[in-house]
Amino acid sequence: MKYIGAHVSAAGGLANAAIRAAEIDATAFALFTKNQRQWRAAPLTTQTIDEFKAACEKYHYTSAQILPHDSYLINLGHPVTEALEKSRDAFIDEMQRCEQLGLSLLNFHPGSHLMQISEEDCLARIAESINIALDKTQGVTAVIENTAGQGSNLGFKFEHLAAIIDGVEDKSRVGVCIDTCHAFAAGYDLRTPAECEKTFADFARIVGFKYLRGMHLNDAKSTFGSRVDRHHSLGEGNIGHDAFRWIMQDDRFDGIPLILETINPDIWAEEIAWLKAQQTEKAVA
């Protein structure tokens, strides 16, 4: 079964994320459990936790269908010790919040070397950051997102993801989330079914589908191989509809959150309905 949804707002309370997901007929959703542009957040109250769990139960969302995202400020590969420690503490807090909410996944951008250390050193720092967080939490899997490779961000090559996983001690609690826009911008073609087959054959060989714990389904305003992260609505960008139809018809993408971060929330319900309709072999544009 495909779990299909969007990254919805949790404004007004975390329980509202589940309510908003249900309103667009989503069978999955993503959310921030705190303000994504601030370091600190008030601890979760018992009331907030209970209301969130109740809303998820009411609308039939299990932890397998929910892909929370951490703060954009966190850089687990930071070259400066003090800043690295700050990011690690914030990441542990994000993991603990997921643990309290009964969530089993935490999606995050791996990190940036800021032109101050080597890629290898940065990737090793990211892996060690994950090890520290896993040691201090239980039941939550760290889900590394591939990036477009803007600036000094790592994670734009499948080899980067594999290197991080290789450095994580508890392989049962690490995974990846593949963002289609990021992959396309990083040079992984998805414009035709044949290119999708090739790209995901590379993924299977280098990383492995056993580590795929989520997807971000985004078309791209950015051009192929541009290393620029600009999302677009499905079928309106440079990837086109075929990739998303191909994903919907491949059972390797079953049982994980497939999350829209497309640019027009007003049509998320339509995009979700379209994706659901592509699951049959006879589906057409």
Curated annotation (Swiss-Prot):
InterPro entries, sorted: AP_endonuc_2, AP_endonuc_F2_Zn_BS, Xyl_isomerase-like_sf, Xyl_isomerase-like_TIM-brl
Enzyme Commission numbers on file: 3.1.21.2
Signal peptide: none
Keywords on record: DNA damage, DNA repair, Endonuclease, Hydrolase, Metal-binding, Nuclease, Zinc
Sites where the protein binds Zn(2+) 3: 182, 229, 231
Record: residues binding Zn(2+) 2: 145, 179, 216, 261
Lineage top rank: taxon: Bacteria
UniProt-annotated binding residues for Zn(2+) 1: 69, 109, 145
Cofactors (names): Zn(2+)
Keyword match Transcription: no
UniProt KW Zinc-finger keyword: no
Any matching Pfam family: AP_endonuc_2
Cofactor annotation comment: Binds 3 Zn(2+) ions.
Family the entry assigns: Belongs to the AP endonuclease 2 family.
Function: Endonuclease IV plays a role in DNA repair. It cleaves phosphodiester bonds at apurinic or apyrimidinic (AP) sites, generating a 3'-hydroxyl group and a 5'-terminal sugar phosphate.
HAMAP family the record matches: Nfo
Name of protein: Probable endonuclease 4
Species the sequence originates in: Escherichia coli O139:H28 (strain E24377A / ETEC)
